[in-house]
């Protein structure tokens, strides 16, 4: 990939490094095969309680948009923990694929929908949504039908995937709140929604390989 294209893609898609100072250094860094090389992690630009979006706009760190892509980053980290406990190669491949897509999703949210951009920002695509749906269908077909709601737990891998699922649900709620105020990429919203479903299915899948799901028993402790 030419450096210019890779550099623009980086600037459009890295919410965790999108301070104005880092963007400035990335823009003026020399051409290389790795345009994301950063020689310094802290920038002091967030010391006033604000952070920069991918387009340079400044927002308070408690803003719902920052909370949304922060939750996506959190979910990605939880998936990383889940991967430490997953032995199935197919599940590992899916989770690693998702981790990369979550950077796309965070980058999408870090670049608000605007018109008349010089460079088209990186956006989550319908193809990525379809990929998630196909994996849901594939893994769900191998599972026994559900007889009750599932309690989060079972194997360590499943427990962490349930955790990631709930974090993604939180991110989706933040994204929906943003969408009531300003345009949000519809594919990004659908991706977040489908991803929580995929993580639920994968949690059940790894549980069936090691330990049965823990089912909810309504009113078990009422008497």
Identify the residue ranges that each predicted region occupies:
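Intrinsic disorder/low-complexity segments
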Residues: 1-33
């Amino acid at each position: 990939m030419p450096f210019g294209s890779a550099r623009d893609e980086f600037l459009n898609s890295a919410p965790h490094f999108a301070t104005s100072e880092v963007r400035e250094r990335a823009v003026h860094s020399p051409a290389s095969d790795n345009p994301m090389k950063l020689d310094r992690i802290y920038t002091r630009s967030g010391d006033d309680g604000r952070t920069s979006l991918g387009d340079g706009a400044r927002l308070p760190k408690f803003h719902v948009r920052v909370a949304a892509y922060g939750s996506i980053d959190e979910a990605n980290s939880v998936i990383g923990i889940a991967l430490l406990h997953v032995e199935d190669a197919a599940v590992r491949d899916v989770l690693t694929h998702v981790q990369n897509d979550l950077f796309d999703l965070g980058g999408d949210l870090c670049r608000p929908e605007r018109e008349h951009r010089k460079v088209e920002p990186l956006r989550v695509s319908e193809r990525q949504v379809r990929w998630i749906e196909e994996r849901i269908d594939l893994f769900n077909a191998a599972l026994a039908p559900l007889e009750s709601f599932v309690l989060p737990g079972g194997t360590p891998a499943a427990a962490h995937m349930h955790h990631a699922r709930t974090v993604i649900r939180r991110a989706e709620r933040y994204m929906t709140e943003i969408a009531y105020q300003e345009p949000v990429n519809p594919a990004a919203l659908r991706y977040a929604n489908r991803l929580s479903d995929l993580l639920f299915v994968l949690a059940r899948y790894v549980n069936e390989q090691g330990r049965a799901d823990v089912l909810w028993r309504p009113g078990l402790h009422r008497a």
